[in-house]
């Protein structure tokens, strides 16, 4: 198996949960970084959650974390998040079309 470095981007994330990434079948993925930028004129709050498919459980990485105007939040920095088959990473804002997200991953490890 080859290790594949990938970048996943989403723009204008709002009040509906967006699945940033779902680990493919028979693969394990390492999330290396997750940067979330506020693209609005006011402070927004963000939720980031992980769904552990094998345990049928969803847990919060951050809940209602404030991101001031013109700044970003590094949700995963200096650590790694392991996603197994069908595990998912999701993000939601408290404000419509307010966030851009960049996700860096290593897939097929």
Language-model features: where?
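C-terminal interaction-tip segments
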Residues: 1-33, 92-109
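A generic structural signal for short beta-strands and their flanking turns/coil linkers
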Residues: 30-32, 42-44, 63, 85-87, ...
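Long beta-sheet-rich domains in secretory-pathway and surface-associated proteins
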Residues: 35-37
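Short, acidic/polar linear motifs in exposed loop/turn regions
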Residues: 39-40, 95
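Hydrophobic beta-strand residues in large extracellular and virion-surface proteins
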Residues: 46-48, 89-91
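Beta-strand signatures of extracellular beta-sandwich domains
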Residues: 47-51, 102-104
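Intrinsically disordered, low-complexity Pro/Gly/Ser/Thr-rich segments with frequent PxxP/GP/PP motifs
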Residues: 54-88
């Amino acid at each position: 198996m080859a290790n594949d470095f990938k970048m996943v981007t989403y723009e204008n994330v709002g009040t509906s949960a967006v699945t940033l990434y779902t680990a493919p079948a028979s693969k394990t993925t390492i999330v290396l970084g997750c940067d979330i930028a506020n693209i609005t004129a006011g402070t927004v709050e963000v939720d980031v959650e992980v769904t552990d498919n094998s345990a049928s459980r969803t847990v919060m990485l951050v809940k209602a974390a404030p991101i001031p105007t013109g700044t970003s939040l590094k949700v995963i920095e200096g650590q790694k998040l392991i996603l197994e088959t069908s595990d998912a990473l999701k993000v939601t804002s408290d404000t419509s079309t307010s966030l851009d997200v960049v996700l860096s991953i290593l897939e097929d490890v």
